[in-house]
Amino acid sequence: MSVIGEKLTEFAGTMTSVAMTETGTVVNNAVDAGPFGTVLYTLTFGETVDAAGETGPHTIRGQCFSPDGTTLTFVGGGTWRNRGHRRELKHVTVLSDGQRTFAVENLDFAAQTASGTIYGLE
């Protein structure tokens, strides 16, 4: 059975842009993610799926610029939940080297920050 594996790293950084579109919000982030290096990624938020308008789906796509000079790309998706001006995300990604990860991420729209924890998937 597949389960969440060990904690790989924590990450923190900034939102570099936010666009409110007719189909949803698009957020670009730049974070420092330890062994993954500098990670640049785009989050695209779908419409809410609950009556309260507090949760919905999202996709993620990005690239890691590792300290050793290598790069990895990744794609994935998950869910988000609003908490005031903050948004909690949980997503699964697949990296170009075959790694699968699970992340819990916190966005603060007022502070324009992104932070969270990345776990391996077994």
Where are these regions (language model features)?
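Beta-strand-enriched cores of mature, soluble protein domains
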Residues: 1-122
